Curated annotation (Swiss-Prot):
Signal peptide start-end: none
Positions of heme binding: 364
SUPFAM superfamilies xrefs: Cytochrome P450
EC id: 1.14.14.-
Transcription in keyword set: no
Organism, as annotated: Sinorhizobium fredii (strain NBRC 101917 / NGR234)
InterPro entries, sorted: Cyt_P450, Cyt_P450_B, Cyt_P450_sf
Keywords linked to the UniProt accession: Heme, Iron, Metal-binding, Monooxygenase, Oxidoreductase, Plasmid
Entry's family note: Belongs to the cytochrome P450 family.
Necessary cofactors: heme
Name listed for the protein in its UniProt record: Probable cytochrome P450 127A1
Length: 414
């Protein structure tokens, strides 16, 4: 399987300024453990970079299109990169490039000062008060899904039956969008993040058409919802352009859905394999807050990439203007210089300064909402479902990539 993936990923030549001693044939897409693997552990597979070799190295193929990147492995170095927006730019137009276009997903792909302007505009949507007001809905969505599962069966595919529909349902409620499109949106997001080039293009077109349709509808018929807020918003005394509305809509429709569902999936798989921890959290749900943070650390899912804006020497490494610089959270959060026994799950770990939601000015806008979804989802599951385990004869399938994921988690409590 991994050999097939290697053939599909193009490798670009190594730039002349990269010292041969800093080249490492490691990739979040093609290294061992990154291809879809039954009972895989991609997080342990990437944690091996801390065992030997330089703390910053050059990977000849570390993006979906086979582009080379510098890989920053230490947590403290990643924080420096993510804080320094002047030297390391976020502007890449990844989503638009799938359509052959060039516009930013907002505010994710903006740099200061524009980033700060748009982030301030959108902050009220993700305030603690607004998330708190949504908590009854989060509990209700989780409870209804789990009750339906428990009523009809003693086994389920937790991703298909719970994690994905739960996270999409909550986020659609958060955005004020109809639940009718949930299954279609799940398919679009899956194709965008994990599909081939053809599927990504088709999904991107569908998402853009959906956002444009919603924006046009809310311009004509305002409501109390996310899209009305966006089309009526003003920055620096002017209304947002159609491209800006689209850039915001794409980010908040796509970002956080697959990643939150994946976090719940990794958590469920861990608890299914560790019955003592499962029972502890079932009997003492007050521990779920710290436990969720530890599982976010251990099973982080996202690689963050920046582009160097100038030639620099960073920790003795010659980074040149235009170089891609990768900050994989799943590597930083297994850094032994940052976390004691990083490959051991400690559900009571204190001062857990992980970067599962990024770091610096681009810290995930929806981090608070995501945390509440994960904790409430686990709480409701443990309260309603008795001791569960991986069904005999089945195996969860994990994969690496730009976003790590897990599927085929067949749980049973018979």
């Amino acid at each position: 399987m991994s050999d097939l993936r290697r053939k599909r990923v193009k490798t670009n030549p190594i730039p002349d300024h990269v010292p041969p001693a800093l080249v490492r044939h490691f990739s979040l897409f093609t290294s061992p453990g990154m291809a879809p693997t039954p009972n895989g552990d991609p997080h342990a597979a990437v944690a091996c970079v801390h065992d030997d070799g330089p703390p910053i190295f050059y990977s000849p193929s570390n993006t979906r299109d086979g582009r080379g990147t510098w890989v920053i492995t230490r947590a403290r170095d990643q924080r420096r990169v993510l804080e320094d927006t002047e030297t390391f730019s976020s502007h890449r137009s990844i989503f638009a490039s799938a359509l052959g276009e060039h516009w930013p997903v907002i505010p994710l792909e903006l740099d200061p000062p524009a980033h700060g302007v748009f982030r301030a505009l959108l902050n009220p949507l993700f305030s603690s008060r607004r998330v708190l007001a949504l908590e009854p809905t989060i509990h209700a969505r989780a409870g209804a899904l789990i009750d339906c599962i428990a009523k009809e069966k003693t086994s389920c595919d937790v991703m298909k039956d719970f994690a994905l529909p739960f996270t999409f349902s909550v986020f659609l409620s958060f955005l004020g969008l109809s639940q009718r499109r949930s299954e279609v949106l799940v398919g679009w997001v899956s194709d965008l993040l994990h599909g081939n080039a053809e599927k990504r293009r088709a999904a991107a077109r569908s998402v853009v058409a959906f956002i444009d349709e919603m924006a046009a509808m809310r311009r004509k018929s305002p409501a109390v919802d996310f899209m009305t807020f966006v089309v009526q918003a003003k920055i620096e005394g002017r209304s947002l352009t159609e491209e800006e509305v689209r850039g915001i809509g794409v980010l908040f429709l796509v970002a956080g859905l697959d990643t939150v569902a994946a976090a719940i999936g990794f958590d469920m798989a861990y608890l299914a394999r560790n019955p003592k921890h499962q029972e502890l959290l079932r009997n003492e749900p007050a521990r779920l807050g710290l436990a969720a943070e530890e599982l976010l650390r251990a099973y982080s899912t996202v690689q963050i990439i920046r582009v160097a804006t100038k030639d620099i020497e960073f920790e003795g490494v010659p980074i040149r203007e235009g170089d891609y610089v990768s900050c994989p959270a799943m590597i930083a959060n297994r850094d032994p210089s940052e976390f004691k026994c990083p490959n051991t799950i400690d559900l009571a770990r204190q001062d857990n300064q992980h970067t599962a939601f990024g770091y610096g000015p681009h810290l995930c806008h929806g981090a608070h909402l995501a945390r509440r979804e994960i904790v409430i989802g686990l709480r409701e599951w443990l309260a309603r479902i008795p001791a569960f385990r991986i069904k005999e004869g089945t195996a969860p399938i994990t994969h690496g990539g730009h976003v790590f994921g897990i599927s085929n988690i067949i749980l049973t409590w018979a």
